[in-house]
């Protein structure tokens, strides 16, 4: 009987300063993707248990504080002014309304509150309200995250001074596939914003979207980019494309759910101390596949009935699933990785 051998994947030592040799070559990440499913899951769960409580998941709520009218042409996004999705552009929400939503999220079990604005970048006139939102949400005892588009150095520092815990700015996909999805913002623009966030002392939340028509190698390219950031992000959201009517990616064939689970597992292995977040597109997975995601190393999920402008599984269904799996909601402090 022929024995199947798997490739040994040995990342280099973690660099202490940039520029540095890559820790994860794309070929190494592809080798992880191509492991037999059971082997990949076993390895991911081993890594996960080394650094986190395997039965604890952080609940996050995401609020769109400024919806629609975005200048960017991201092919997946209903909020782009380039696409006819029927979404009406709205102004930035009042601070009090945002804080009311944060209180409701906390009452519903969330320990993390994310605020997203459909902008290319915030204007200086927006900053006082944004920093007030951060301070107000933190006073409620919630972990804070914002995603506002590209930032200047001064804006990143203002958010840091307000106490922002995380700033989300996704790479979206690999450098090779990026141009097929977005033309109004370069890959380097995204990397520059991440550098500004890091330099300001804010934790980085950075992931991507899979299922946009990219190849497995291009998915591996995204993970390689994320894992080779120095340091890699503290928070890594993995989104499953929601093919929204009126966007260029409308009608894109759904990704095999097992490939989504594989991506979660590979993210966990390559970024062992990151919080891997099960994000948009979760409603496309049945309960069994969501359970697989937790087994693969996802330890946070977006919770609530709406995720920006796409639907999310209902909270009652989420609670029922947690009960069936023996998973408990965890606060932000418990999400700190073990050494």
From Swiss-Prot:
SUPFAM superfamilies per the UniProt record, alphabetical: Radical SAM enzymes
MF terms (GO), sorted A to Z: 2 iron, 2 sulfur cluster binding; 4 iron, 4 sulfur cluster binding; biotin synthase activity; iron ion binding
Associated pathway: Cofactor biosynthesis; biotin biosynthesis; biotin from 7,8-diaminononanoate: step 2/2
EC number(s) on file: 2.8.1.6
Superkingdom as given in the UniProt entry: Bacteria
Cofactor comment: Binds 1 [4Fe-4S] cluster. The cluster is coordinated with 3 cysteines and an exchangeable S-adenosyl-L-methionine. Binds 1 [2Fe-2S] cluster. The cluster is coordinated with 3 cysteines and 1 arginine.
Catalysis: reaction(s): (4R,5S)-dethiobiotin + (sulfur carrier)-SH + 2 reduced [2Fe-2S]-[ferredoxin] + 2 S-adenosyl-L-methionine = (sulfur carrier)-H + biotin + 2 5'-deoxyadenosine + 2 L-methionine + 2 oxidized [2Fe-2S]-[ferredoxin]
Binding site residues for [2Fe-2S] cluster: 114, 145, 205, 277
Gene Ontology terms: biological process: biotin biosynthetic process
Cofactor(s) needed: [4Fe-4S] cluster; [2Fe-2S] cluster
Positions with a binding annotation for [4Fe-4S] cluster: 70, 74, 77
Keywords (A to Z) from UniProt: 2Fe-2S, 4Fe-4S, Biotin biosynthesis, Iron, Iron-sulfur, Metal-binding, S-adenosyl-L-methionine, Transferase
HAMAP family for the chain: BioB
Subunit structure, interactors included: Homodimer.
Family: Belongs to the radical SAM superfamily. Biotin synthase family.
Function recorded in the entry: Catalyzes the conversion of dethiobiotin (DTB) to biotin by the insertion of a sulfur atom into dethiobiotin via a radical-based mechanism.
Protein name in the entry: Biotin synthase
Species of origin: Burkholderia ambifaria (strain MC40-6)
Biological classification of the source: Bacteria, Pseudomonadati, Pseudomonadota, Betaproteobacteria, Burkholderiales
